[in-house]
């Protein structure tokens, strides 16, 4: 394993996680590469591959608006030679009812910035149903 690559990935993810915990939107946005790609699974209107920082961040902002998501905790950060992972717990709102979900966020890093993310939700069906219901 390339220790320098995993160290760089861990450094980037740790910086991102600190900004996320602090709710520092400017610092969060500075962690993304201009060519960032978001892989959002499921069958919701937000599902798909979103290429480019602007397009990907628009989807993330739309998810935040629809779900009223709130970070509860980042339980772990890990890094290997080619990917890093953040395990997060968030609260989302479904029909005004708060629900806690675990999310696994797998990242690729390039130029010391987040270059790609695969979002894996604990209950994809629940997420899809919530996103289908919220249309405003």
Regions found by a protein language model. Give the residues of each.
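Short, low-complexity N-terminal intrinsically disordered segments enriched in polar/charged residues
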Residues: 1-34, 131-136
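Short, cysteine-centered beta-strand-loop-beta hairpins and adjacent loop/turn segments enriched
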Residues: 92-100
């Amino acid at each position: 394993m390339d220790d320098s690559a995993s160290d760089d990935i861990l450094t980037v993810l740790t910086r991102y996680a600190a900004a996320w915990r602090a709710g520092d939107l400017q610092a969060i946005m500075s962690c993304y590469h201009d060519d960032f790609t978001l892989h959002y699974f499921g069958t919701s209107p937000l599902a798909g591959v979103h290429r480019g920082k602007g397009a990907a961040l628009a989807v993330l902002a739309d998810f935040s608006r629809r779900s009223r998501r709130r970070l509860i905790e980042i339980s772990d950060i890990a890094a290997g030679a080619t990917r890093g992972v953040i395990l997060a717990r968030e609260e989302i709102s479904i029909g005004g009812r708060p629900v806690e979900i675990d999310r696994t966020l797998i990242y690729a890093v390039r130029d010391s910035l987040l270059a790609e993310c695969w979002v894996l939700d604990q209950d994809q069906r629940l997420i899809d149903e919530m996103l289908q219901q919220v249309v405003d």
